[in-house]
Curated annotation (Swiss-Prot):
GO molecular function: ATP binding; metal ion binding; pantothenate kinase activity
Binding site for K(+): D138
Alphabetical UniProt keywords: ATP-binding, Coenzyme A biosynthesis, Cytoplasm, Kinase, Metal-binding, Nucleotide-binding, Potassium, Transferase
Record: residues binding substrate: Y108, G115, A116, D117, R118, T193
Listed HAMAP family: Pantothen_kinase_3
Protein name: Type III pantothenate kinase
Subunit-level organization: Homodimer.
Cofactor entry: NH4(+); K(+)
Keyword RNA-binding: no
Co-factor note (free text): A monovalent cation. Ammonium or potassium.
GO terms classed as biological process: coenzyme A biosynthetic process
Length: 268
């Protein structure tokens, strides 16, 4: 459901929780200031006592949250997290989903399967760039592309393995290839097996992402050489990948969190 409703900017404490496959990020927003952010391993949500202590510690340091939102790609963790937050702070929890009031028009064959993190990123992209076409890329456990046209209509997306998933697959599905941490190589070609894996995954991801951005832009309605699409990139591995791609116009590692907060304010 697309909305033109204005967003409240009152200076109340808002807690947003982004539960990912690997890492969970928590952010406390107050007014329009930059959020206070911290991250924990998502496995923590299997320990209710530890989760309660984490939330109470945040409240002690930043004030009791008056509005809360949970965005999760792990359904079981989302349910337990929301229940704990409601119990601890006696506030309703907004769960990010396609059924919320959205600042863009989501045309998707299976909206119930559209990732909550992708919804938040699209929402922030539309809010940030207004009437410009946007290509939003999240370089995390998976690499996702989501595309909005100049009218705020969702045009489609892409999902591919993230760089750590690629490294894990090479290790787990072969007999001799080691598990390699991926960072920026010093050269294109590797001169050891570890270097070859690292270089292949890193530069392969760079070329894939750059090529797909160009291909999407070429067929995106409303884009021209005079007014190209904005390209917003976020995600845990965005900082090492983004500098290698000239077509990326904006890098914001907090973009999903900002989108969750935006949706919280739109739906509170």
């Amino acid at each position: 459901m697309q909305s033109s409703r204005s967003v409240s900017t009152e200076a109340f404490v808002r807690l947003v929780v982004d539960i990912g496959n690997t890492t969970t990020t928590l952010a406390v927003f107050t007014g329009e200031t930059e959020p206070s952010v911290e991250s924990v391993q998502s496995t923590l949500f299997g320990e209710p006592k530890a989760v309660a202590e984490l939330f109470l510690s945040l409240a002690h340091r930043h004030g009791t949250p008056q509005a809360v939102a949970v965005c999760s790609v792990v359904p079981a963790a989302a349910a337990s997290c929301s229940a704990q937050l409601e119990s601890l702070f006696s506030v309703p929890v907004v769960t990010i989903a396609a059924s919320l009031r959205l600042p863009f028009q989501l045309d998707y064959a299976t909206p119930h399967t559209f990732g909550a993190d992708r919804i938040a990123l699209c929402a922030w992209s539309r809010h940030l760039f207004g009437d410009c076409p946007v290509i939003a890329v999240d370089i995390g456990t998976a690499i996702t592309f989501d595309v909005l046209d100049a009218e705020g209509n969702y045009r489609g997306g892409l999902i591919m393995p993230g760089i750590d998933m690629m490294a894990g697959a090479l290790n787990s599905r072969t007999a001799q290839l080691p598990l390699v941490d991926i960072d920026k190589p010093e050269s294109l070609l590797g001169r050891s097996t570890i270097e070859c894996i690292r270089n292949g995954i890193f530069w392969g991801a760079v070329r894939q992402i750059a090529g797909l951005i160009d291909a999407i832009g070429a067929e995106l309605p409303g884009e021209s050489k005079a007014a190209p699409a904005e390209v917003l990139v976020t995600g845990g591995n965005s900082r090492i990948i983004a500098p290698e791609i000239a077509s990326i116009t904006h890098l914001d590692e907090l973009a999903v969190l900002r989108g969750i907060d935006l949706l919280l304010r739109l739906n509170s």
